[in-house]
């Protein structure tokens, strides 16, 4: 997947799920499943419900995404 093919959206984590997966509510109201990117795992960045995050979605499956940034 090329970097230009991703769609970046802002959202808020609503629920923790097993295996470092989260339910994220996007700005437009849609709910997606998000998993933590490898760099965030490597640097032990914790994500809790209520955190604002940036999610990358692919045009092929808009129901799942990768959490790439946690805003303060």
UniProtKB/Swiss-Prot annotation:
Pfam families: eIF-1a (PF01176). Keywords: Cytoplasm, Initiation factor, Protein biosynthesis, RNA-binding, rRNA-binding. SMART domains: S1 (SM00316). Residues 1-72 form the S1-like domain. GO terms for molecular function: ribosome binding; rRNA binding; translation initiation factor activity. CDD domains: S1_IF1. It is found in: Cytoplasm. One of its GO terms (cellular component) is cytosol. Its main location: cytoplasm. InterPro entries: NA-bd_OB-fold, RNA-binding_domain_S1_IF1, S1_domain, TIF_IF1. It comes from the Bacteria. One of the essential components for the initiation of protein synthesis. Stabilizes the binding of IF-2 and IF-3 on the 30S subunit to which N-formylmethionyl-tRNA(fMet) subsequently binds. Helps modulate mRNA selection, yielding the 30S pre-initiation complex (PIC). Upon addition of the 50S ribosomal subunit IF-1, IF-2 and IF-3 are released leaving the mature 70S translation initiation complex. Belongs to the IF-1 family. HAMAP family: IF_1 (MF_00075). NCBIfam families: infA. Component of the 30S ribosomal translation pre-initiation complex which assembles on the 30S ribosome in the order IF-2 and IF-3, IF-1 and N-formylmethionyl-tRNA(fMet); mRNA recruitment can occur at any time during PIC assembly. This is Translation initiation factor IF-1 2.
């Amino acid at each position: 997947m090329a970097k230009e093919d991703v769609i970046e959206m802002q959202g808020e984590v609503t629920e923790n799920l097993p295996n470092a997966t989260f339910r994220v509510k996007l700005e437009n109201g849609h709910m997606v499943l998000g998993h933590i990117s490898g760099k965030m795992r490597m640097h032990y960045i914790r994500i809790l419900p209520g955190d604002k995050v940036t999610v990358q979605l692919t045009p092929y499956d808009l129901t799942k995404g990768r959490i790439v940034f946690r805003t303060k």
